[in-house]
Design a protein with these regions (language model features):
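Membrane-interface helix-boundary motifs at transmembrane edges
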Residues: 28-40, 97-108
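Membrane-interface interhelical loops and short amphipathic "cap" helices
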Residues: 6, 60-71, 131-139
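Membrane-proximal helix-loop-helix units in multi-pass membrane proteins
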Residues: 45, 51-104
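Single conserved hydrophobic/aromatic residue that forms the stacking wall/gate
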Residues: 1-12
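C-terminal ends of transmembrane alpha-helices
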Residues: 51-64, 118-133
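Membrane-helix boundary/juxtamembrane motif in polytopic membrane proteins
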Residues: 95-118, 138
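Hydrophobic cores of alpha-helical transmembrane segments in multi-pass inner/ER membrane proteins
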Residues: 15-28, 79-94, 143-160
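Terminal transmembrane helical module of multi-pass membrane proteins
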Residues: 100-103, 120-160
Length: 164
């Protein structure tokens, strides 16, 4: 059915818009030199970038093959690992400083939104491989709500800093 397929396209567009907006806000927060909690925004920016790359089919764009190679599949995983590894290593080295910050974040509204978003993404992924008539719509709906929660978390972060 063309209308169902078109409706699903609208869901994809909304997902990408929410992810892109969330990514831009989290990058903006990460670039704020005076915030003590910017490390959380850096990790969140990398995660949002990875989710955004997963949501868009980079192969469908008129980009060089090397961009497709690093923006999808194993290349994407390697790229994100290379981006995330130094940040996590830095956090491990500065464990005392960041342990309390991470704990406070997960006990805040931001953390609640991130945990709920993760849970909804897991639930949505369960429908990805099920053979239901509207399984894709169910999966994408869960993802859209999850991305809305990610946006909520980033928006809350942009409004106030959590200090240790």
């Amino acid at each position: 059915d063309a209308s169902w397929s078109r409706g699903l396209g609208d869901v994809y567009k909304r997902q990408v818009c929410l992810l892109l907006l969330s990514l831009l806000i989290s990058i903006y927060i990460a670039l704020d030199r005076v915030r003590e909690d910017k490390i959380i925004s850096i990790v969140l920016s990398i995660a949002l970038f990875g989710i955004l790359l997963r949501e868009i089919d980079i192969e469908d764009f008129n980009v060089p093959m090397w961009v497709v190679a690093i923006g999808s599949g194993d290349g994407r995983t390697l790229l994100l690992s290379i981006m995330l590894a130094p940040v996590l290593l830095f956090m491990i080295v500065k464990y005392q400083k960041y342990y309390d910050l991470v704990k406070k974040y997960f006990l805040s509204q931001v953390g609640l939104s991130l945990v709920l978003s993760f849970c909804l993404l897991l639930i949505g992924s369960m429908f990805e491989h099920e053979y239901l008539l509207s399984r894709t719509l169910i999966e994408e709906s869960f993802e859209l709500i999850a991305y809305g929660l990610l946006f909520r978390a980033v928006f809350i972060m942009s409004q106030s800093e959590i200090k240790v």
